[in-house]
Amino acid sequence: MQEKSLQFQIARQCVFFVAFLFLAGGLTACASAPFHLAPPADVYEDAIPTGYGRIRGWADAAPDNLEALLEGRAALLKRRFADTIAAGQPIRLSYLALSGGGQEGAFGAGLLNGWTQSGTRPEFEVVTGISTGALIAPFAFLGPDWDDALKEAYTTMTTDSILIPSILKGLFGGLALADAAPFRRTIENFATEEMFRLIAAEHRKGRRLYVGTSALDAARPVVWDIGAIANSDVPGALKLFHDIILASASIPGAFPPVLIKVEVDGKQYSELHVDGGVTAQVFAYPAQIDIRDIDKLMPTGFERIIYVIRNTTDRPPYENIRQRILPLARRSISVLIAYQGIGDLYRIALNAKRDGIEFKLASIPVSWDMEPEESFDQKYMTALFALGERIGREGIPWRSRPLAADSEAEIAATN
């Protein structure tokens, strides 16, 4: 089956770029780009977005104020679940991690809608999103009241509403092969002030919404606390929310990086942020954090479940590859992305096992064989949404291991 997602189209164009490298090299000096001054290497970890406090962290390390965060978290949980604690019952918490996948995010959007219809969808204490998962995450966080808006987002999306091709500009010194202005407008249409206000309210209750990006200068994954941003009262906070979602889904080469202003010791700098999928296809929490540490601060126990929705199949489908540079490059990148995602799933599953959290995974059935005709194919996305919705409504075949799919159950789900 041919994979026609945006990542693979970009692979083709990148190879094309190499062929024109010397021709374009003489012209790149004339190209313009936003001024970018990265923080010095010895202080970059201390950078904070200009005007904000602690609204983000590194996804590959525990925060330096972890003890204070755990104590604050315990205090919130004691207030929220006072009745449960008084009754001597365990606190039940559900977490949701949403992966990348481009237009295949329609599956996750449909699954959430169908899950609501089944009457078994829980309220999620924490929601995380990467790339297309970052687009879904705010809707999932706010619950079933936003299902219709989520459906609209993923069944009306088209290539024209996401990008404007600018291949020649990209080849001759530009920052990308496409203009992301339509994508920003699409994000602004769905990530509204009302959504932002409601995220802030849920954050104050103790729930958390996190979005992942990749900091190119630092070559590290970044986790943004969207609720903290929404509660910051900093002018332009809504724009930063839009910037983060755009960055999380900005495939390098396809879209330009998103420049975010930061400061260190009163000095102004900037960072380049791109697709969270560059550093992780899906994330939950850093392995350096042991969730059980919070249990020691609580008078009762926990029952925790982490649900992972992977917006792709387990592995790339079998394909007879032509021995040409473009098919070889496309297939190699496809396999690289797929196995990066598998590694991420194993990390989440192992951390969950260590911390006593039940792990549940759902992904696109291996029997799904419809092919998209373009980068964001509305017909394809609508069909994939419908598949996810039906699976969610009829009963999601959750798996307890990253690659332990029950093939018969998956095949039955698509029949």
Please give the residue ranges for each predicted region.
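Aromatic (phenylalanine/tyrosine) cluster motif
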Residues: F8, F16-F22
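Patatin-like phospholipase
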Residues: A31-E125, F141-N415
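C-terminal motif of bacterial Sec signal peptides marking the signal peptidase cleavage site
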Residues: G26-A29
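N-terminal secretory signal peptides that target proteins for export/translocation
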Residues: M1-R12
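Catalytic nucleophile serine of serine hydrolases
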Residues: G102, I130-S131
